């Protein structure tokens, strides 16, 4: 699915949508409801997903590099092997999210909540974690 050139209304309801392999590069999805959506292998490079609801969304192998996920809710989301390089995830809720083998290199997770997140094998090179709540519940200073 290629939605390049289409306008997606702010706060769109895409709950449980099948967007597998979707080309959403640079998409404006701020405030969208994508809870439970299938975004496996989706291209969300530079997409604006700030304040969006991505609870329990499936984002395996998705490219979210340089996307804005500030204040987004990704609790319980599956981001296995996803690309989150240079992604803005400020105050993002990642409670219980699966981030195993995800590439988070140089992402900004300032104030993010990672409580109970699974991060086995995740690339954390250069990640900003000031004020973030870590998987074990401790606060990163």
Positions of PLM-derived features:
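Tandem repeat scaffolds
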Residues: 1-141
């Amino acid at each position: 699915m290629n939605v390049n050139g289409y306008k997606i209304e702010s706060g769109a309801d895409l709950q449980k949508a099948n967007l597998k392999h979707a080309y959403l590069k640079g998409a404006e999805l701020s405030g969208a409801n994508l809870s439970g959506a299938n975004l496996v292998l989706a291209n969300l490079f530079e997409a604006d997903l700030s304040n969006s609801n991505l609870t329990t969304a499936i984002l395996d192998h998705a490219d979210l590099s340089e996307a804005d996920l500030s204040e987004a809710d990704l609790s319980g989301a599956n981001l296995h092997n996803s690309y989150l390089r240079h992604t803005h995830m400020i105050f993002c809720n990642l409670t219980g999210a699966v981030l195993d083998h995800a590439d988070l290199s140089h992402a900004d997770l300032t104030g993010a909540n990672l409580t109970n997140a699974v991060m086995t094998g995740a690339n954390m090179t250069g990640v900003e974690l000031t004020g973030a709540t870590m998987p074990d519940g401790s606060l990163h200073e």
